Curated annotation (Swiss-Prot):
This is Phosphoglycerate kinase. It catalyses: (2R)-3-phosphoglycerate + ATP = (2R)-3-phospho-glyceroyl phosphate + ADP. Belongs to the phosphoglycerate kinase family. PANTHER family: PHOSPHOGLYCERATE KINASE, PHOSPHOGLYCERATE KINASE 1, CHLOROPLASTIC-RELATED.
Amino acid sequence: MAKKTILDLQDEELKGKRVLVRVDFNVPIKNGVITDDRRIREALPTIKYLIDRGAKVILVSHLGRPKGFQDDLRLDPVAKRLSELLGKPVKKLNDCIGEEVEKEISNMKEGDVVLLENIRFYKEEEANDPEFAKKLAKLADLYVNDAFGTAHRAHASTAGVAQYIPGVAGLLMKKEIEIMGKALESPERPFICILGGAKVSDKIGVIKNLMTKVDGFLIGGGMMFTFLKALGYETGKSIVEDDKLELAKEIMNMAKERGVEFLLPKDAVVVKEIKEDAPTSIKDVDKFEKDDIGVDIGPKTIELFREEILKARTIIWNGPMGIFEIPAFANGTRRIAEAIAENKNCISIVGGGDSAAAIQMLGLEDKFTHISTGGGASLEFLEGKELPGVAVLQDK
């Protein structure tokens, strides 16, 4: 990795130093209880590394999308869970900046950990307000960005603060960038990209950037119908972006010219209305009627995609194959996840968001090489964009 990480620092550069670590503790909480602590667990290696070297660790994160101070979005449950995982107390402060916070930090001993309050309680955070960033920077000697999930945002705690104190990457950030970077720069082949989700427009940047890198695309999810309609198929009442039909044609022609395989579904699970108990049928994509709605890929498509997946050596997957939140429409996503898990010879990378949620629901996390902690950030990384939260860190 071209950016400095905490591993590039000498132990004496950390001992006794105040280190402000941007983590991504944006975890789901129901009635004060964290329902999935994966993001907290992912940050542990960096936090432990700093504790072991005698740093004073000051953690900063957002939670949800608060409008000003909101009691239900305070970080107390997060501090409690982190304390259990670390086996040591984590003091949660009631603010992010100001005298009280500065006083608490001045009383910290080597190896202590504090968690600042939800940084998005301040609108200055998302505005990347320089004065606010300066106040945050004043709390510490060194900045560590370990929040890949927000690295595509230029906010005060993800980018602004590194204008005032030296910034380096944490271990999770390093892992995310190295694994995805290697897949893009020197992949084992065949290299395929599986794309799903509702909209082509969300994935255009990824398709264009990967077109020169991959051997093939497998297209599922709602976006398949925009491509099918562009080819002249009847798609019924399925989700279609009519203003993207020309673009869809252009993408398919680009793939053809470059000799990149562009596989569209052969069949789909079809309903007349989207609801949990809707009667389903399987139809080939050329047999749709005017009132049909496609909600998942069908068995022929699953088999076709499975064959490609088992041959691949590098797989990037972003977006579910159907409306997986409804169990009856989740089979395609499940079978694709199982096929990737079955391929023991491939590097498999999942770009956060819905696909990651689906894999967790199926309990297959440990069968994938890497499940990104960032949905939007991994998409922008795959689009070839430089992420603001990485750009500001020191070069090696």
